[in-house]
Amino acid sequence: MSGSTITPWVVGNWKMNPMRANANQLIEEFKQLLQQNQIADENCHVGVAPVSIALTTVQAQLQDAARTVHTVAQDVSRVAGTGAYTGEVSAELLKDSQINFVLVGHSERRDIFGDNVEILKAKLQNALNAGMTVIYCVGESLEQREQGQAEQVVLQQICDIAPVVTAEQWQNQVVIAYEPIWAIGTGKTASPQDAQAMHAKIREGLCQLTPAGSNIAILYGGSVKAENAVELAACPDINGALVGGASLKAASFYQIVQAFAQSK
C-alpha cells in the first residue's frame, strides 16, 4: 500500500559538524532561502539535527524562520529521567528544553558505538514515553545486500522494536528512515527503483505490524543530494529524506526540501 498521501519529511543530520560560526551562517542562509521562496508547513515537515550542545541555540535561531523548522536530537540516553549518569541526556531533559524530535538507531550509532537491539529499544521506549517523535533508522550493509538478505535484515530491525511501541505511538510518534549503510558517506546511492522497492517492502511490513502502517512516513537516507532528490521524491513510498552532507550547505538542503514539498 502506497504512502503517497503522507506529508513528507526532510531532516538534515549534521552529525559531528560544523563549528559554531559555520552553524550560525548555515542557519541564517537557510532562513533567507525560506524567506525568499516560502514552502508551506503542510507541504513538508522540515528538521535539522545539530550536535547536542547546539540544540537550544539552533532552536532559538530558527524561531523567526518563515516556516516551522524542527530541531531534532541526534541521539538520546537509554536511561530515563535524571540521575548520576555522566555524559547522558535523557528524553525527559530533551523535552524539558522543548526538543520534541530525536533520531534513534542511526547506523553510525550501531556500528561505531555499539547500540544493539536492547539499547535501541530502551532509547526508543524512553523517547516515546516522554512524548517525543522518533525517527527510527534501519538499513543493511553491503555484505548483507550482496547475500540477498537486505529485506530480511531491514524488516527484522523493525520487528525488533514492535514490543515497545503502542498502537497510538505508531500512529502519532514514529517515523522510519531507511538508510542503506553502503550508501552513507560513500557517494553511492541506490537507484530510485531500488529505494522504492525497499520502501514498499517496509510499508508492507509496517502494515502487518500496525493498522497505522499505511500512514507512517518512510524517509530515504542514502546519500540524498539536490541532484537526485526530485527523482527520489517521485517514488510513492519515499516520504522524505534523512540528509547528511548535503544538509551542511543551505542551498542544497533547501533544494531537497523543495523537491519533496512539490512532489506530493
UniProtKB/Swiss-Prot annotation:
Pathway(s) of this molecule: Carbohydrate biosynthesis; gluconeogenesis; Carbohydrate degradation; glycolysis; D-glyceraldehyde 3-phosphate from glycerone phosphate: step 1/1
EC code(s) of this entry: 5.3.1.1
Alphabetical list of Pfam families matching this protein: TIM
Key words, A-Z: Cytoplasm, Gluconeogenesis, Glycolysis, Isomerase
Binding site for substrate: 13-15, 185, 223, 244-245
Known role: Involved in the gluconeogenesis. Catalyzes stereospecifically the conversion of dihydroxyacetone phosphate (DHAP) to D-glyceraldehyde-3-phosphate (G3P).
Name by which UniProt lists this protein: Triosephosphate isomerase
Source species: Acinetobacter baumannii (strain AYE)
Lineage: Bacteria, Pseudomonadati, Pseudomonadota, Gammaproteobacteria, Moraxellales
